[in-house]
Swiss-Prot record:
InterPro entries: FAD-bd_FR_type (IPR017927), Flavoprot_Pyr_Nucl_cyt_Rdtase (IPR001709), FNR (IPR015701), FNR_nucleotide-bd (IPR039261), FNR_plant_Cyanobacteria (IPR035442), OxRdtase_FAD/NAD-bd (IPR001433), Riboflavin_synthase-like_b-brl (IPR017938). Its EC number is 1.18.1.2. Gene3D superfamilies: Nucleotide-binding domain of ferredoxin-NADP reductase (FNR) module (3.40.50.80), Translation factors (2.40.30.10). It comes from the Eukaryota. It comes from Nicotiana tabacum (Common tobacco). The gene is PETH. It catalyses: 2 reduced [2Fe-2S]-[ferredoxin] + NADP(+) + H(+) = 2 oxidized [2Fe-2S]-[ferredoxin] + NADPH. This is Ferredoxin--NADP reductase, leaf-type isozyme, chloroplastic. The keyword NADP applies. One of its GO terms (molecular function) is electron transfer activity.
């Protein structure tokens, strides 16, 4: 807590007149104020003692309200909670990966009648039907919204998700199915779904319509960026028109796993000066060294340009997807920063504080 010190100093002259001075000091450290005799020399006579009267208060200075660089005005969180979820209905559920893709991913649209006021970059929770092994309701699972606030139908009455069906073999050789992902991927139109939220402010879009927005996604981590890009390039808003640069890097294992490819290519055709698109298909592509093309491998091909952009105060990085992607991206940035005598870990902290480095991995 800051401490305010107010000191009154009286300097009596040989003619019995007095001079009074008052000052205030704000210090962020604790102040130990000791009474110390202070002398001054009066040119008309000898030295005289100055008396000091101190008043110490512990009133904190008024906090300066931080102004966010993101579109956070009026953002609502946790309108619906697990005990009282919103009950929506499935309107559409379709598989968006090829039959030969390693795993299924589904795009689904739920009716909300405008009751779940999410924003681009937020998430919603879903509670699967049924109970767990202990007879209790299943815990909610969070999913990034894959639609803009207007929804896929443009009427602000729906929300869309992008969900991969989780199926794996455990240590005992048994097939295990993720409860919520399989519940969602199996939903039929008309079925009810319990929704909580919306939640999250980390991944909200930047306010600046002239910003450079670099999006790094693996797999279903594409969801929030689809919502960004729909708002940027497929919609018209009275209070928002994107004039900056949106650059999407999407990493997947096979071409049949590329999500929303046709949509993104249409956006590129519509706004070639504002939208850049780079895919990294690890099982099918390699770089000039013959290395598999992961998302960080693709980024390395643009390392100099990315580093230059990252040093501008209107460049925003968003990362969403598998947790493993973060290390590879950090390694690229660390090498570039070191070349300029910068410690990447410290620089990244500054970017996070400035809301320019935003991560949501799982």
């Amino acid at each position: 807590m800051a401490t305010a010190v107010s000191a009154a100093v009286s300097l009596p002259s040989s003619k019995s007149t007095s001079f009074s001075s008052r000052t205030s000091i704000i210090s962020t450290d604790k102040i130990n104020f000791n009474k110390v005799p202070l002398y001054y020399r009066n040119v008309s006579g000898g030295s005289r003692l100055v008396s000091i009267r101190a008043q110490v208060t512990t009133e904190a200075p008024a906090k300066v309200e931080k102004i966010s660089k993101k579109q956070d005005e009026g953002v609502i969180v946790n309108k619906f909670r697990p005990k009282e979820p919103y009950v929506g209905r499935c309107l559409l559920n379709t598989k968006i990966t090829g039959d030969d893709a390693p795993g299924e991913t589904w795009h689904m649209v739920f009716s909300t009648e405008g009751e779940v006021p999410y924003r681009e970059g937020q998430s919603i929770g879903v509670i699967a039907d049924g109970v767990d092994a202990n007879g209790k309701p299943h815990k909610l699972r969070l999913y990034s919204t894959a639609s803009s606030a207007l929804g896929d139908f443009g009427d602000s009455k729906t929300v869309s998700l992008c969900v991969k069906r989780l199926v794996y073999t455990n240590d005992k050789g048994e097939e295990v199915k993720g409860v919520c992902s399989n519940f969602l991927c199996d939903l039929k139109p008309g079925a009810e779904v319990k929704i909580t939220g919306p939640v999250g402010k980390e991944m909200l879009m930047p306010k600046d319509p002239n910003a450079t927005v670099i999006m790094l996604a693996t797999g279903t981590g594409i969801a929030p960026f689809r919502s960004f890009l729909w708002k940027m390039f497929f919609e018209k808003h009275e209070d928002y028109k994107f004039n900056g640069t949106a650059w999407l890097f999407l990493g997947v294992p096979t071409s049949s796993s590329l999500l929303y490819k046709e949509e993104f290519e249409k956006m590129k055709e519509k706004a070639p000066e504002n939208f850049r698109l780079d895919f990294a298909v690890s099982r099918e592509q390699t770089n000039e060294k013959g290395e598999k093309m992961y998302i960080q491998t693709r980024m390395a091909q643009y390392a100099e340009e990315l580093w230059t952009l990252l040093q501008k105060d209107n460049t925003f990085i968003y990362m969403c997807g598998l947790k493993g992607m973060e290390q590879g991206i950090d390694e690229i940035m660390s090498a570039l920063a070191e070349r300029d005598g910068i410690v990447w870990a410290d620089y990244k902290k500054q970017l996070k504080k400035a809301e320019q480095w935003n991560v949501e991995v799982y």
